[in-house]
A protein has these predicted regions:
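Conserved nucleotide-sugar donor-binding subdomain of glycosyltransferases
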Residues: 71-108, 115-116
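Conserved nucleotide-sugar phosphate-binding/catalytic loop shared by glycosyltransferases and other
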Residues: 9, 27-28, 32-86
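An aromatic- and histidine-rich active-site surface loop
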Residues: 44, 109-124
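Donor-nucleotide binding loops and adjacent catalytic segments primarily
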Residues: 193-271
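A donor-sugar binding/catalytic signature common to diverse glycosyltransferases
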Residues: 109-112, 264-304
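A short, glycine/small-residue-rich beta-strand->loop->alpha-helix junction that serves as a flexible
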Residues: 7-19
Length: 307
């Protein structure tokens, strides 16, 4: 079977899922004919993804939430204005997707939470069936309980999630809890997509805390906390575009640019893990029985709570 991937390219989560599923498919005799990655101007496509993906990669401009001025939270107003201005470009991206789906020769399109894929299937109804995969599809499950706070944000996230899966024949919701499938919505609950490397590296208990911050602006908070706790050894991964591979603040605080293999090495040897978001990294830490601290953020925390 020939498969075409369309991936939402923000952060490392969906990209890591795509790499994992690509290997699973090829190991079982299938082929991934291409990977189309939707991205904004705010982030770069990580080098680890470019290096490890076997199928040819192409990118297109996609709507995404912009960070706030401090690069700590979602800038909702900025995001709305920016995406309205960019809407003509998004129409070009929709045509790009339609043409590639039609000409790919694929038997199946797998959509990793890319909103323009849903819009493309809604507008043009491509003949190639679409399957959507992501932990966010748990939001659609009737038994899934969201927190009581931030109701408006929840409604926006659920609406966004529904748009990503327009026209899908099947939705696969990743979860580390067991739920019954919802056949009415064609929603199946499946385990997280863990990379083989995440399960094969031996676990050792080091003397440092590992962290991952989705928005680089939170590095200021990490540094402030570190000044009050200078004896605790910290290693944090971030996605700051202009950063060196390793940024050493002092003897006990180091920031690392996102690198999947390097991250797994540090995860295997940490004594605890702290993060502002990232479902996949939380799953990998849970697999290794690491103590985990999840810092709630507007929008980000919705992606990992109670899954």
């Amino acid at each position: 079977m020939k498969v075409l991937f369309v991936v939402q390219g923000e952060g490392r989560g969906h990209l890591t899922q795509a790499l994992t599923l690509e290997k699973m498919l090829t190991d079982n005799g299938h082929s991934v004919v291409g990977i189309l990655v939707g991205k904004s101007c705010a982030r770069e496509l990580p080098e680890f993804f470019i290096d490890r993906a076997q199928a040819p990669i192409q990118t297109f401009l996609s709507p995404n939430f912009l960070p706030s001025k401090t690069n700590k939270h979602i800038g909702l107003t900025r995001s709305i204005i920016y995406n309205i201005i960019k809407s003509p470009n998004y129409m070009s991206s929709i045509h790009f997707l339609k043409n590639h789906i039609d000409k790919s020769g694929a038997d199946l399109v797998i959509n990793f939470y890319e909103v323009l894929t849903g819009i493309t299937y809604y507008l043009y109804q491509p003949q190639v069936p679409e399957v959507c995969i992501g932990h966010q599809y748990m939001f659609l499950h009737p038994e899934y309980q969201l927190p009581e706070e931030h109701k408006f944000s929840q409604q926006l996230m659920i609406a966004f999630t529904k748009v990503t899966c327009l026209g899908a024949k099947k939705k696969l919701a990743l979860s580390f809890h067991k739920y019954e499938d919802d056949n009415i919505q064609n929603l199946s609950i499946v385990p997280p997509l863990l990379r083989s490397e995440a399960t094969s590296i031996p676990r050792h208990h080091g003397d440092y805390v590992l962290g991952y911050i989705l928005n680089a602006g939170f590095s200021e908070n990490v540094i402030e906390w570190h000044k009050r706790n200078p004896k605790l050894n910290l290693h944090f991964f971030w996605d700051r575009k202009d950063a060196e591979e390793t940024t050493i603040i002092d003897e006990t605080l180091t920031f690392h640019r996102i690198d999947d293999k390097k991250f797994l090495h540090y995860l295997a040897n940490c004594k605890a893990y702290a993060t502002t978001g990232g479902f996949e990294s939380v799953c990998e830490a849970m697999y290794r029985y690491c103590p985990i601290k999840v810092c709630k953020l507007l929008f980000s925390y919705l992606c990992i709570c109670k899954l």
